């Protein structure tokens, strides 16, 4: 089943919903970073969250970055997303893997840790990006984002994120949703939705059964006048280039760049988001020194 993201409303706009199936997207990210099972679940949840949240951006030039650092062996997860639904991300330690938790599930919280913060950074081309930050609530990512929305944006929200890792380490199913109550929404409605979310199967279970994202949302919001407003194809896509990596190399400063040049060797840099390697010869390092630091 192709990945798909939809935006919807229910109950005459009292509820705003973004839902997605992200199996292929997550599989691509997990393969690029060669993730162990628990690391795959952590990165996959963050990538799914990024895809969902990125579509709330107003301009295609805007970016949304999610960071979670909890002091655990995952060594943090970073995801950057865009308005068109494409995302990229990385986990500090792709080999992070521990025993399943007491429910027999991959222990994402156990590798993320709970001693740290979740950051949401919106760069809208202004002088300074908007940064929202909350302490990690559980380390399971979905609950942390729901806590962020409630505390930092004063929007009561439910966030469901799921990643099912197969025995061959490929992603069997992945997806998620963000459900938000709009100002003035009926409190009884919020209670009803909370009850339904407790009763439904996990999102990965529903995706594995072949349900589309529309069918999943119709199941949750039965008799609530669900209206699909927009459909987007999310994907994992890195926009790195030799020019960007060259600027990153130049940004380390003249002194460090001169040391690299004086060693007389080539310099290899890898993109954090896709692991693509960029090699700069000794002469090219010299050219960068000349172009960025010579006195004009």
UniProtKB/Swiss-Prot annotation:
InterPro entries given in the database record: Heat_shock_Hsp33 (IPR000397), Heat_shock_Hsp33_C (IPR016154), Heat_shock_Hsp33_N (IPR016153)
CDD domains found in the cross-reference section: Hsp33 (cd00498)
Posttranslational modification: Under oxidizing conditions two disulfide bonds are formed involving the reactive cysteines. Under reducing conditions zinc is bound to the reactive cysteines and the protein is inactive.
Entry's Gene Ontology cellular component terms: cytoplasm
GO molecular function, one term: unfolded protein binding
Disulphide bridges, residue numbers: 238-240, 271-274
Cited HAMAP family: HslO
Described function: Redox regulated molecular chaperone. Protects both thermally unfolding and oxidatively damaged proteins from irreversible aggregation. Plays an important role in the bacterial defense system toward oxidative stress.
Descriptive protein name: 33 kDa chaperonin
Organism lineage: Bacteria, Bacillati, Bacillota, Clostridia, Eubacteriales
């Amino acid at each position: 089943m192709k990945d798909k993201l939809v935006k919807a409303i229910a109950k005459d706009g009292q509820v705003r919903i973004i839902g997605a199936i992200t199996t292929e997207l997550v599989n691509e990210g997990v393969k690029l970073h060669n993730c162990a099972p628990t690391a795959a679940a952590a990165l996959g949840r963050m990538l799914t969250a990024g895809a969902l949240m990125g579509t709330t951006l107003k301009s295609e030039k805007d970016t949304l970055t999610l960071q979670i650092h909890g002091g655990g062996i995952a060594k943090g997860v970073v995801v950057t997303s865009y308005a068109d639904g494409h995302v990229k991300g990385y986990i500090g330690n792709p080999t992070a893997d521990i025993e399943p938790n007491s429910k027999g599930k991959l222990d994402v919280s156990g590798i993320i840790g709970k001693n740290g913060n979740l950051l949401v950074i919106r760069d809208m081309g202004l002088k300074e990006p908007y940064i929202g930050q909350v302490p990690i609530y559980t380390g399971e990512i979905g609950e942390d984002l729901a806590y962020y929305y409630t505390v930092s944006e004063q929007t009561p929200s439910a966030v469901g994120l799921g990643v099912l890792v197969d025995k061959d380490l490929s992603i069997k199913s992945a997806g998620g949703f963000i459900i938000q109550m709009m100002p003035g929404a009926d409190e009884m409605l919020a209670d009803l939705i909370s009850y339904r979310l407790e009763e439904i199967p996990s999102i990965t279970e529903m995706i594995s059964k072949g349900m589309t994202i529309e069918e999943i949302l119709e199941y949750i919001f039965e008799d609530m006048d669900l209206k699909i407003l927009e459909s987007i194809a999310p994907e994992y896509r890195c926009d790195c280039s030799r020019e960007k990596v060259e600027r990153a190399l130049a940004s380390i400063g003249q002194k460090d760049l001169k040391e690299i040049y004086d060693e007389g060797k080539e310099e290899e840099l890898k993109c954090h988001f896709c692991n693509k390697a960029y090699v700069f010869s000794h002469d090219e390092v010299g050219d960068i020194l000349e172009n960025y630091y010579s006195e004009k």
